[in-house]
A protein has these predicted regions:
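Beta-strand secondary-structure signal
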Residues: 6-8, 21, 37
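Short acidic/glycine-enriched loop/turn segments that link adjacent beta-strands
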Residues: 31-34
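Short beta-strand-centered aromatic/proline hotspots
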Residues: 17-28
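Intrinsically disordered, low-complexity, charged/polar segments
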Residues: 37-65
Length: 65
């Protein structure tokens, strides 16, 4: 994963039952974990435009169409 890469964030992250596409804005690497900020293409139903993800298993690379 790298900044600027298109990804899909699992629905469990936002809790709205929808997988969200977006772009990685920042990656913070710490001793035992990485934190990834993703900006979504469209807002979640409650108006948030992104997520901070600590479980990297909840992010996958978006496949080209």
């Amino acid at each position: 994963m790298r900044v600027g890469e298109r990804v899909i964030v699992d629905a469990a992250v936002t809790g709205d039952g929808v997988h969200h596409s977006g772009v990685i804005e920042d990656i913070y690497d710490f001793a035992r974990t990485s934190i990834v900020d993703v900006h979504f293409d469209e807002p979640t139903p409650w108006g948030t435009w992104g997520a901070t993800v600590t479980n990297l298993g909840m992010i996958r690379k978006e496949e080209a169409a």
